[in-house]
Amino acid sequence: MSMLHLVRTSAFQTSDFQQCLNVIQANDTIVLLDDGCYNLSHDLWQQALSKIALPALYIVEAHAQARAITIDKEKINTLSLDALMTLICATEKSVTWQ
């Protein structure tokens, strides 16, 4: 069964993103939200790309925009807040990294 990983913190401040990558499986999904959006510019992002296929990598667009983060839509998919709620409700298992 796949897991939804909600990453709310920056790897520049905590080890939560590294811990997430240590346990992630190939069929899991990662969503960057809140300060987790900063992980797009962290070295660990390349590790995330090597473990998870693009269709399962998301960022909450409103949270990235609020932090003036440029989104390369070839490297990550965007979610609206409504789409995030739909994804959470449709997923049986999730963990929040915060």
Which residues are covered by each model-predicted region?
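A general structural motif
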Residues: 2, 27, 54, 91-92
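Short internal beta-strands
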Residues: 29-34, 55-63
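Short, glycine-rich nucleotide/cofactor-binding loops
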Residues: 3-16, 34-40
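Short, conserved loop/helix-junction motifs that constitute active-site signature segments
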Residues: 22-26, 47-54
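Extended, well-folded catalytic/binding cores that form a central cleft or groove in large enzyme
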Residues: 19, 56-59, 87
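C-terminal structural segments of small proteins and small subunits
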Residues: 67-98
